[in-house]
A protein has these predicted regions:
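Binding-site signature for planar aromatic cofactors or substrates
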Residues: 1-199
Length: 199
């Protein structure tokens, strides 16, 4: 028996938003760690990010990064990007095209920083930016950080590097794999026009 969303566009939207919402708090969700892809000139770069917010009302997705990360420089030059989600058990793939907004030391980051746990804040306390060349294997952290030997007050030093990337969704392509026959659809969130596609 096929799921309700097999041939119903509205049910498809309800399904993928439910999966995105769940991924924000469910560490076991495959949708929690999508591939984020952005491009600069003739190079396309991809990496795993952690989904931190899903907002259906405003068509937004959100993740955190370090202001010194190379992807921030790329997004400053070209804010268009894509997120790729896949859930093996659900057999659902999402290709999400977005426009990105970089937030640093503003109300958006203040709100997210307050929710960021002690264990996660150390990522923003490294002396060297992400991607810096090193002669030896390294976490980039001094031993005190690796051992979590710092207070919440000391962790505030990392706030200047803490950055929130807001991804305004332009379109979503949904693919469902089924033995009976795959299903594929595109949802244009800018024009509110949806269409079935040949898988």
């Amino acid at each position: 028996m096929q799921p309700a969303y097999y041939e119903n566009l509205e049910e498809i939207q309800n399904k993928y938003w439910s999966m995105l919402d769940d991924a924000v708090t469910n560490r076991a969700s495959p949708f929690r760690i999508p591939v984020f892809m952005c491009a600069h000139q003739d190079e396309i770069d991809g990496r795993i990010v952690v989904l931190r917010k899903s907002d259906r009302e405003n068509n937004l997705l959100q993740f955190h990064t370090d202001l010194r990360s190379p992807k921030v420089d790329i997004l400053k030059k070209n804010n268009k990007a894509s997120l790729l989600f896949y859930d093996k058990e659900e057999k659902i793939q999402l290709r999400v095209k977005v426009d990105c907004e970089i937030n640093n030391q503003n109300p958006t980051t203040e709100k997210s920083w307050k929710k960021t746990q002690h264990i996660s804040r150390r990522c923003y306390l490294t002396d060297s930016p992400p991607g810096t060349t090193s002669e030896n294997p390294t976490s980039g952290m001094i031993s005190k950080l690796e051992d979590f030997d710092y207070t919440m007050e000391q962790s505030e030093e990392g706030y200047k590097n803490f950055t929130v990337i807001k991804c305004k969704i332009k379109s979503i392509e949904w693919l469902y794999l089924a033995a009976k026959g795959h299903r594929r659809a595109k949802f244009d969130l800018e024009t509110n026009k949806n269409a079935w596609l040949v898988p």
